[in-house]
Amino acid sequence: MLNKKNTFEDYITSAKFLIEKKYTYNGGIIGYGGSAGGLLMGAVVNKAPELFLGMVIQVGFLDSLTTNLDHSLPLSLGELTEFGDGKGNPDHFKYLKSYSPYHNIKQMDYPNLLLVTNLKDARVLFDEPTKFTAKLRQYKTDKNLLL
């Protein structure tokens, strides 16, 4: 369970491979992910925004730390084996915080971003994409689209 960041590193490594082999160019990739795939997109855009022209995140799991801490949510307890228990284990808390997209937004340039939420999604609370978008508006240093 403390290997989740391998997913993000693998995605970034794959993107760099495509650039190196000239299938695309640095800043020319458009990423897409929803739900847990949105977690992936949020984490990689924070780690390597220069690789992307844009990104679509549909109902993304973007505040994974806060959701993990709330065991009253229907999916939180079921996901402890995959993501760890930030509420009951300090090491898991630190690990979750180290990649939670919302908690790792920085003052820097971000690519064009389209974030979609859904009031009736059973897996991801609607406020995760909205909080992520609001914080990005405060922190991003570029003029790229943020919708």
Which residues are covered by each model-predicted region?
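Active-site-proximal cap/loop segments of hydrolase catalytic domains
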Residues: M1-L147
